[in-house]
Amino acid sequence: MSDFWHKLGCCVVEKPQPKKKRKRIDRSMIGEPMNFVHLTHVGSGDMGAGDGLPMAGTVQQQMRSKCGRDRQWSNSRVL
């Protein structure tokens, strides 16, 4: 009887799921931006001296003044 279960176990094997092929996106599928709000420009004058990073306080202050909200902008990605 154990031989039967051994042979049955060899036949019942979990097969790997085939990878789903992602649909390719072309330019005709992409439309104009919706609900776009332009807050500010960040140019070379807004960059920190020598470090190549924007001065966070200045950029955040510009964004607050442009959108008219008193929202506290954070540096984290979690909103």
From Swiss-Prot:
Keyword 4Fe-4S tagged? no
Q: Which GO terms describe its biological process?
A: regulation of cell shape; regulation of Rho protein signal transduction
Q: Where in the cell is it found?
A: Cytoplasm, Cytoskeleton; Cell membrane
* The keyword Lipoprotein belongs to this UniProt entry's keyword annotation: yes
Quote the cellular component terms of the Gene Ontology held in the record: cytoplasm; cytoskeleton; plasma membrane
The function of this protein is: Probably involved in the organization of the actin cytoskeleton by acting downstream of CDC42, inducing actin filament assembly.
Q: What is this protein called?
A: CDC42 small effector protein 1-A
Which organism was this protein described from?
Answer: Xenopus laevis (African clawed frog)
